[in-house]
Amino acid sequence: MIEIDAKGLHYRDLNRRIKNLIRAGEREFYLHNINGQRYIGDGVKEKVNITIDGVPGNDLGAFMDGPRIVVKNNAQDAVANTMNSGEIIIHGDAGDVLGYGMRGGRLFIRGDVGYRVGIHMKAYQGKTPLLIVGGGAMDFLGEYMAGGIIIVLGMNRRKNRPLVGSFVGTGMHGGVIYLRGEVEPHQLGKEVK
């Protein structure tokens, strides 16, 4: 296992180091002191395992096709952007626009997520993306969704926070959203009423 201390390390230098090590045959990574570094795991096609201690920045696992990433804390926005395959597990909360255009793979978030999660998700070349939220989600969940599965469990959400916000499934024309709990009709987009 390769351990990298990312304290003070620019995101370009971190990602260059990871990709060079993957090209050299390394497959197990443990990243310490991650503090907002962007693009970790982006475009990686090899079957690698990356464990992150800290909070990764935007676009974690974007265009990813095979790796497994485990985040021990929270994550910022755009996790799994246009992800093709692989698995991302976040043991905390995550930000906005998770799973944007996700075409395959699995994304698990223990806590709450922000706005526009699952926007433009689609099934692609026989793959069905799966996005599971342990807490709650804010507005525009599954907006313009064309395929895939979103599940919101509501088990780990903050007190006084609804299961989902407004406009769930707005523009949705494929895929399925499962919500564990009550949702008012006014919270749903007209396409899913």
Question: What annotation goes with each model-predicted range?
Answer:
Residues 1-193:
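Long, distal/terminal scaffolding or interaction modules
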